[in-house]
């Protein structure tokens, strides 16, 4: 249970840290500013100065739905729709990801049959589906529940990001969270993701009427991940990952931009989880190194921070992070409560 709580808390820590430097496109400048503040150990995160972004709030909202006493998945989807639409009110004053806003505008909470059915969205490839789905993998972490994980992560993703690069990002982070709970070797996660994509495609073919318009970008997501695994030398799921000898902040920014689709690292559903995964591979149990790679870079650092922080919590718990980062964190008690209730819900078969 402690690691479920740590996942929710450290995900929010990563989000809050990343949000602080969201507008800065230079990782070296960000790291320089952090040193001037005394480093990570000197920071005291609180609600006033380090508020959570829309990404963390949508992750919490998804978790809220997953711990309700729903009878069937359709009831869960209706609850997700209701909470997502309500969440748009609580996000006022923040700058939510555009795809999330547009997706929620298409949801129909009062239409019993079509509540979560949204049209294909050419602009729905953003990271917002990926950043709200780790809790889905925590809820359905058991290997025998893979089918449910695939279905729920895709449907929750499509509600706000009905585009393969968007909703496959949701599948990716949910899957990675389940692997973390299972204790699977980290180096195998990417290969297992690619092995799961055919199951996702089979589900989509059964449920999406016009699958043809999804096909091209589906292959893009798959190809980007295949390329990444080959670059790191881990396409077999067991070799030791290969990193460049020079891997400072500038090199990190250059590499992350290369993985992106439009030059802004972590903006899309394929590369936000990719950056988080790469940082986890490189950092091991070193929280500060994880932050340097997954949060203190010149891209969409709140998204990559949220994903990586959550997965780090599932792998290593809370003790590796300085107390000041989470002791007075925005919504700390709520995050811990959600972690505990996700753990208990996952233990009960439905």
UniProtKB/Swiss-Prot annotation:
Its main location: cytoplasm. Keywords: Cytoplasm. InterPro entries: ADP-ribosylarg_hydro (IPR012108), ADP-ribosylglycohydrolase (IPR050792), Ribosyl_crysJ1 (IPR005502), Ribosyl_crysJ1_sf (IPR036705). One of its GO terms (molecular function) is ADP-ribosylarginine hydrolase activity. One of its GO terms (cellular component) is sarcomere. GO terms for biological process: cardiac chamber ballooning; cardiac myofibril assembly; protein de-ADP-ribosylation. It comes from the Eukaryota. It is found in: Cytoplasm, Myofibril, Sarcomere. Gene3D superfamilies: ADP-ribosylation/Crystallin J1. PANTHER family: ADP-RIBOSYLGLYCOHYDROLASE, INACTIVE ADP-RIBOSYLTRANSFERASE ARH2. Belongs to the ADP-ribosylglycohydrolase family. Required for myofibril assembly and outgrowth of the cardiac chambers in the developing heart. Appears to be catalytically inactive, showing no activity against O-acetyl-ADP-ribose. This is Inactive ADP-ribosyltransferase arh2. It comes from Danio rerio (Zebrafish). The lineage of its organism: Eukaryota, Metazoa, Chordata, Craniata, Vertebrata. The gene is adprhl1.
